[in-house]
Amino acid sequence: MNCRSEVLEVSVEGRQVDEAMLGLLHTILLHRSTGKFHYKKEGTYSIGTVGTQDVDCDFIDFTFVRVSSDELDRVIRKAVAEFKDALGNSGSDGMGQISLEFYQKKKSRWPFSDECIPWEVWSIKVNVVNLANEQERQICREKVGEKLGEKVINIVEVINRHEYLPKMPTQSEVDNVFDTSLKDVQPYLYKITYQITDSLGTSVSTTMRRLIKDTLAL
């Protein structure tokens, strides 16, 4: 099985990191989650509904849609907060990458542990820019919102392709495909990791600075 890999790049102000990452990660998970499975007997089941809610950002002109699961939101917020703290403490000019990996488990014989096989990985490269004044911050607020809107469209286009998804599991195998620990939603098994690096390149940051400069010149 080949693992799909998608890379998104964003350039944001420090106070926008949380909202930008939450918006993108929640958008992906919205399309990679189902309602809870309710098995009647082996081979037959019903799927519960998945509620959604709009989230307005405070520091970006952007609204995203997420699964209305407070449990899932807490997990994502915790991971994003850790990533933001690591960015702030790194001294690497505010560059890093946060990744959302979907995987399925393959049972192994005792005494070996189960094998985790990734089937889709989303990597978000982040560059934090420093702005000089409130005028630049307002422009950045608008431009980042536009860029995130483009990223959301890109995410939806990728997810709507007819490519590999794990097949619906039997009741005995559901934990090999889905995270069943949440009471109100059932995302595909996933993990979030991050790394801080000074080797991401400066193309995104340069583009954002150029956008701000061009807008100021109007």
UniProtKB/Swiss-Prot annotation:
Where is the protein localized? Cytoplasm; Preautophagosomal structure
> What PANTHER family would the database entry show?
AUTOPHAGY-RELATED PROTEIN 101
Q: Which organism is it from?
A: Danio rerio
| InterPro entries given in the database record | ATG101
Function description: Autophagy factor required for autophagosome formation.
Q: Tell me the GO molecular function terms.
A: protein kinase binding
According to its UniProt entry, the protein's GO biological process terms are: autophagosome assembly
Q: Name one GO cellular component term.
A: phagophore assembly site
User: What is the name attached to this protein's record?
Assistant: Autophagy-related protein 101
* The entry's keywords: Autophagy, Cytoplasm
Pfam families on file: ATG101
Q: Which domain of life is it from?
A: Eukaryota
Record-stated family: Belongs to the ATG101 family.
